[in-house]
Amino acid sequence: MTAVPEFTVIIPTHNHARLLPYAIHSVLTQTVGSFELIVIGDGVGDDTRDAVADLSRNNKQITFVDRPKSPRTGEPYRHEELLRRETPYVTYVSDDDLLFPDHLEHTREMLATHDLVHGFGLHVDAAGSLVLELVDLGQEWFRRRELKKTSHASLTAMGHTMPAYRRLPYGWRTTPPGKFTDHYMFQQFLSDPACHVSTLRRPTALKFPFILRQTWTDDEREQEMALWARRLSDVKERAMLLNEIMTLLHRQAILLEIWRGKRVWWLWNLLAALRRWMQR
């Protein structure tokens, strides 16, 4: 009898045949080895089929699901696959993003006490610089914003328990026009007051937003992915990367304190002016 893995990792894909192998490799090199990887094709071409076949030929952890193009990004296909599985944990990565080697390790630790986790916000801009997205869905203020129109949700590094998924009224479903697919799914989880949510406390994934790279050629995108994949796979490079992130966090904290100071000073002046007006 085959043992049930701890994780189901899902990579939805459509037309990133040259980038997909890097995303897959970032899953295969995880420090937690108990996982299955489901690559869900949403109207893919032969180049994507060939790319997955090359990687899955000698690796039984990879399953390729080849489906016709859906109205959006193949959300119902994800639902079908999850209903077939009994793994305790689920996580995702976009086909043009990368996971740190310890993503499953830290996600498992967080999901031991939470139903849903959101990845530590980190992406690379078009100039090659790291950008932090400071969000904590464990805080009620952020949760309320996410339930409205603001979207900080990201598929990459999203994780949830299978029991929490089965409690949802719908699960993955076709997203209405004008809405982000990831945000639409997060809202379903967050609409349940009993859903225990948090954000990972350290970076475990690196995103490369397509919206910042719409004019890039396939060669340019692959060169970028190859560069960062090498950095993430090297222990020393990864340590340097974490130092860069700590520097960014320190800078953000200083800016926040400056902003708070200015806000307090502005409020103090306003109160002083009101007191003077009332004493007239």
Locate the predicted segments by residue.
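Boundary detector for helix-to-coil junctions that initiate low-complexity/charged tails
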Residues: 230, 234-280
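Nucleotide-sugar donor-binding/catalytic module of glycosyltransferases
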Residues: 1-249
